[in-house]
């Protein structure tokens, strides 16, 4: 079932009440009485050892880039390591002032550091360093660029029960690992589940976790986020790992008071839009007696993994991260922070020395420092290789940034309807880039930016490096295409064969198939938007550029849709439109293929052809496959051209079918004889005329004053003179 029409992943719905479970009962007031055990605070001894030869980290080894967040425990910064062995690597640095931490908070901080140092799991955030100064504690963690799961699912995506199952399954593996170490998580909520750049989850924020010696030991403190608390936590009757499995299945209420009442009185219900398997799992998780709760038995998480709801999950593949996530966050360079609250990212990063705490506080944190052994070679010596140093990407954070402060603008590379492209040089690094300057009054670039952020890491899609906005224009800084346009390169070659054309089309079709599989259509795949990043002429160096007309498949409410949602819940007319747009992309590739093989364009003889003449030829669907180069071109090539240029867009091959065509799969059988071609400028002129004619066939309606309409003028003529 589709779920994303909800404002929150688990809002309170009209529910069918569950029968309260016999067993534990408690008055609501029980949650208000402090526990005797809660007042006992003990320092947690730290027994972790550091590999011989490792060096302790300190604040001077990290360059502050941005503020990512701020909470009751301190600030989180995006930082770059500036010393070996991992110089250039980006981390999230959690900084806590000792002087402002309560004693209880200090214990929690040490607890978080101990837990993270122990944990090594694909779905739990990794601790790389921990150290302290006189006034502060530092945790250096993975920098997870995808933001938190709650923000992503509630604000951006139409998702289904199948999609939610993926996240819950990864979460179950992460929790199971923590439980195997004797750790109760106790603060499980969507805000503490982050996404990496691929869309896999990572559990984070272990400040409320509690290590238990064995499964019999209970914790008593009143902690966690109330919406997700198990009844035994609210009632302070002692809780074990099973409290996490309650939180795992909880439905979030409208407000804290209402949620607390529901938890205490067991007035939980079951949303009827869920499948029977999902309802069965929730009923098994929502047992007020923790001993009866699924996951609390001797098999632990294995009970949950065996549940029928997860019958479609391959747990081994999931652990190896081989199952594709339903949603890929839009992230560009490794140091971007598009997915963090602008309230924090717009602040100037500043880490003050911190007021020294009381005399005994430093002793409380003894043994706090930690170095990840993964940063050392097997023999204990530091690694000699360095991570690549990335250029700083300045992002839009509600301010107008001056592009010329960071870059020197050079000559114009190209001019479009809504933008101009220029070469530019980054002042700090002297690196060359291209900048696309878009007139905001003529075009909204937000979709183009989002697509480039989400998919620009593909090897054959242009990479977005930086974004500026001065109010009137948006500046998109991308890698510089030094090799020029595809057709220029091909037609200037002294020798170009059919086999080489197959390699070129293979690379481009692979990229288009990737975009289409993600619900993205380019809609402007003319040859001038396919360029080489260098002058090698290698097909793998091709880049698809200019996503100004590109679209992502969205629902009527504007949200993106996961593949599962698209397959099950999208209206036929929406899919038909998407198929039409995909067909247009294939048609453009067909034009390119025809031109590479024939040496001239299929529907235009030259730049002097009128749009009407060109459109008539396109509409007829007729083009020649005989004479000239066609006498030596293979029959499989002619077959592919015919199927890509079919007059009906819904009967054209898909990008996937193009990749499966014998002309692509059996390149070694293709001729290697030289293909002749018309004059370069004639071919380019004819190609430009073709796309100009296509654009002219879609006139934009012009809105005029209502008084200028024929109906309004006729009414004025009929009015008596006294009313004028």
UniProtKB/Swiss-Prot annotation:
Primary site of residence: nucleus
Sites bearing Phosphothreonine, chain numbering: 348, 562
Catalysed conversion reaction: L-seryl-[protein] + ATP = O-phospho-L-seryl-[protein] + ADP + H(+); L-threonyl-[protein] + ATP = O-phospho-L-threonyl-[protein] + ADP + H(+)
Keyword check for Kinase: yes
Residue numbers bearing the Phosphoserine modification: 54, 221, 296, 352, 358, 369, 721
EC identifiers of the protein: 2.7.11.1
Keyword tags: ATP-binding, Cytoplasm, Kinase, Nucleotide-binding, Nucleus, Phosphoprotein, Repeat, Serine/threonine-protein kinase, Transferase
Cofactor: Mg(2+)
Localisation per UniProt entry: Nucleus; Cytoplasm
Sequence ranges assigned to domain AGC-kinase C-terminal in this UniProt record: 311-380
Record GO terms (molecular function): ATP binding; DNA-binding transcription factor binding; kinase activity; magnesium ion binding; protein serine kinase activity; protein serine/threonine kinase activity; protein serine/threonine/tyrosine kinase activity
Residues the record marks as active site: 187 (proton acceptor), 524 (proton acceptor)
Tissues in which the UniProt entry reports expression: Intestine, thymus, and lung.
UniProt keyword Lipid metabolism present: no
Post-translational modification: Activated by phosphorylation at Ser-221 by PDPK1. Autophosphorylated on Ser-369, as part of the activation process. May be phosphorylated at Thr-348 and Ser-352 by MAPK1/ERK2 and MAPK3/ERK1.
InterPro entries: AGC-kinase_C, Kinase-like_dom_sf, Pkinase_C, Prot_kinase_dom, Protein_kinase_ATP_BS, Ribosomal_S6_kinase_II, RSK_N, Ser/Thr_kinase_AS
Gene Ontology cellular-component annotations: cytoplasm; nucleus; spindle; synapse
Domain Protein kinase residue range list: 62-310, 407-664
Gene Ontology annotations of biological process type: hepatocyte proliferation; intracellular signal transduction; negative regulation of apoptotic process; positive regulation of hepatic stellate cell activation
Record function comment: Serine/threonine-protein kinase that acts downstream of ERK (MAPK1/ERK2 and MAPK3/ERK1) signaling and mediates mitogenic and stress-induced activation of the transcription factors CREB1, ETV1/ER81 and NR4A1/NUR77, regulates translation through RPS6 and EIF4B phosphorylation, and mediates cellular proliferation, survival, and differentiation by modulating mTOR signaling and repressing pro-apoptotic function of BAD and DAPK1. In fibroblast, is required for EGF-stimulated phosphorylation of CREB1, which results in the subsequent transcriptional activation of several immediate-early genes.
Quaternary structure (record): Forms a complex with either MAPK1/ERK2 or MAPK3/ERK1 in quiescent cells. Transiently dissociates following mitogenic stimulation. Interacts with ETV1/ER81 and FGFR1.
Protein name: Ribosomal protein S6 kinase alpha-1
Native source organism of the sequence: Mus musculus
